[in-house]
Amino acid sequence: AHDRRHGIEPSPGTRATGTEPGDYLAVGPDWKGGTPNGIKKVFRSTTPFTLAVVRTQLFNPGDMPNVEKIQSGYKAQPLSAFLKQPAPPAAPKIDFLAANTAGIKDNFFQYLDAALQFVPETPRDKAIRAKLARIGIGPGKTFAFKDLSLEHKAEILVGMKQGDDKVDKWLASGNKDINGWKVGSFFGDEAFFNGDWLMRAGAAKGGLYGNDAAEAMYPYTRTDATGEPLDGSKHKYIITFPPGQLPPVNAFWSVTMYD
C-alpha cells in the first residue's frame, strides 16, 4: 500500500500479517478514531489518497481455482459500509488537472502546486516546503514559470538540471554494485526516508511503488556486462543464470524493462 508520499509499512500480506482472512482499515492523516470492532489493523496514510497494489501468487496452471477463490474474497469498501452505518456526506468534487506526460512536462510547476494540496505537510517536510513557498510553490499557490524574467528562468532550469544530475549520480553510486547490478534498499515509509530527499527522488526515479527490503529487492542496471548503456535499438541482450543458480525467492522473481 502507498500514499502520495511513500509506502505504508508493513502492508497486509503473507509475510507481514499471515494467511488468515481479515479486515484492515486504511485511514488518512485526519483520522482521529480508534480501531473499530472487527478491524485487525489500522494502516495510517500521510495523505488523503492511498493506492493498494494486490498480488495473488499462482504456483502453476492447476492452482488457478485457488487463486480465483482468494481473489473473490477481496473487497474494498468504505468504513461506513463495513460498520453497516449510514454513509457520510459525499466529499466535495475535486477538479483534477488532466494527467498526461506532455502536459506535466510543459506545465510542471502547475502540476506540482496542484499535487501538493493533497500532500499535507509533516515535520520532516517543513524545511523544504518553506523553501518552495519562498518562490511561490505550494498548495494554493500559482508559480508561473512563463512570467519569470529570462535570468530567473535560467536559474530555475539550471537548478532542475543539477538536481536531476544528483539523482542520477545517487542511483549510479548510492547502492552496492554486484556484477554490474545496483542492489540496495530503495523503498519504505516516512521513517525509512527520514527526510532524505535525495534518496526519495532516487527511489521515485528508479521505480515508483516498490516494497521495502523485507518484502522485496529490486536490483537494477542501465548497462550491459561491459559497462555500455543498454540500447535496444542497437543490440539484443541475454541474461544467463548458471544451472542451479536461479534467484532465491520465497514467492517470485521477474525481469522488467523500462523505456
Predicted regions and their residues:
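A compositional/structural signature for long, glycine/proline-rich flexible linkers
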Residues: 1-259
